[in-house]
Amino acid sequence: MLEKILRSESGNVHYWISNTIRKESLSLFFLHGLTASHDLFVNQIGYFEKDYNVIVWDAPAHGMSRPYRGFSYEKVANDVIKILKENKIDSAVLIGQSMGGYIAQSVIKRFPEYVKAFVSIDSTPFGEKYYSKIDRWILKHIEGMSKLYPDKSLRKAIAKQNTNSKHAYENMYNMLSVYDKDELCHLMAIGYAGFMEDNCNLQINCPTLLLVGEKDNTGKVRQYNKAWSNEINVPITWIRDAAHNSNDDQPEQVNRCIKEFLLGIAE
């Protein structure tokens, strides 16, 4: 994988891409969740890069892509497209975990022609009807609520909430370690509040795969996905013994499900 940097007035965005882009192969863009980094997909990169063009990044305001001024999902969606154009990729399968699914839907909202397919991993849908007033209030006030936790307790709570295995817990905890408490709390605020601002009723016309950990107890993720599944007539694929970071908890299951999906859309 080659490390590259997308440079902009808002900040530098670090990403990693296959050494050679093969025009005949599908391109996969892996989009990690809030407060994580490209390390979330450590168990996907090696599995997929032999057959596909693979891109992973540290999303704007995350990991190595800091500082980043004026985070918004519109900006981030544009950054995704700039990376594709920079590497002469006409379209990609967007694979988004949690916040990464919001980014994918933000791209679909603005640039549907660049999205070959969408894989949602423990994410939730765009759409006004899914979120109650209390849901929106909580998401808009997450910064203040998270500041009530002592620093170390906050990191442990986030890592524990998101995972159901020792290796995934340790990976999540390490990804959180690059932020001080104020930055971590603010990042959660802009991630969730930004989603509420960008949220809209969205029709997704590309092939879609919904993956959800059976033990995902983050917010109402399972409830939202059941409603989403019914709305778009796409069944949920439940990942056994996995929490919110299901691709890290159970990489073999998730990789197999994604591979079967990719083979289906390539036919």
Model regions and ranges:
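Flexible "cap/lid" loop of the alpha/beta hydrolase fold
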Residues: Q105, K109, K116-S146
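Conserved loop-alpha-helix segment in the C-terminal half of the alpha/beta-hydrolase fold
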Residues: T208-A242, D248
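Conserved HGGG/HGGXW glycine-rich cap/lid loop of the alpha/beta-hydrolase fold
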Residues: G11-R66
